[in-house]
Amino acid sequence: MKFSLILTLFLVLMVGCESSEKKTKSKSDNIRKVQNFHGKSNIKLTQTILDSILPGDIVLRRGDGPLSFHLSNTTKEVFTHCGIIVKENQQLKVIHSLGGQVSKQEIDGVQLSSLTHFVNYASDSLLYICRPIFVDSANYKVAKEAYKYLEKKIPFDHRFSMLSKDKFYCSELLYYVFKNINNQKNIFTIKKKHRAYMLLFSTFFNTNNFTKIYAIQPKIKY
């Protein structure tokens, strides 16, 4: 009886250890995949580049977190995060929407970051800056509209739904800013997948609507 009880406990421990080992291995594999995806940026914007940037320019980066990793896998696009460049006290900053769990500032939603801070978290040193040209005085209008949403403290859209205007994920912020200054006409490339609509970053490579200012990116055709 005693031997039987000891044997049973031994088997339970063995199974538990094996299960734990599998879970740990699976978790490690996932962490390794994410680690291979991101890393703090080594990008240093020169003064010449900084002088060429205007308020209202758009900046794209490849995000440095697990959400960006999965987003890139879903959209099959290089870039995963975007924002609108503005200027305060002669300093370039970025208005963008980020979830509180990944925001370095622990703000959930539309927020203001320095351009340096934004660039520092460009994973794999992938960065793209472009200028909107789809309406007259687009830069001024884009920056002004972005500030309106910043002042409203719009929270992050964790459901990633384009149907709601009271919460924004990153490209959704730009989607509504662009529509507001373009007589409610959409310029975003939209892709439907699994009953959801995705706002694609390929939008910013349309030379009819945007002009490239600066780019560090792989040679990919959009």
Ranges and model annotations:
Residues 14-16:
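C-terminal motif of bacterial Sec signal peptides marking the signal peptidase cleavage site
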Residues 18-88:
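N-terminal accessory segments that precede or flank the first globular/catalytic domain
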Residues 67-68, 124-189:
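Active-site nucleophile-His-acid catalytic modules used for acyl/amide transfer and hydrolysis
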Residues 18-25, 158-222:
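Activation targets extended, charge/polar-rich intrinsically disordered C-terminal tails
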Residues 101, 136, 194:
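Residue-level detector of flexible, active-site-proximal loop/helix-junction positions
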Residues 2-8:
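Sec-dependent signal peptide recognition
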Residues 61-127, 155-168:
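Glycine-rich catalytic cores of cysteine/serine-nucleophile enzymes that process amide/ester linkages
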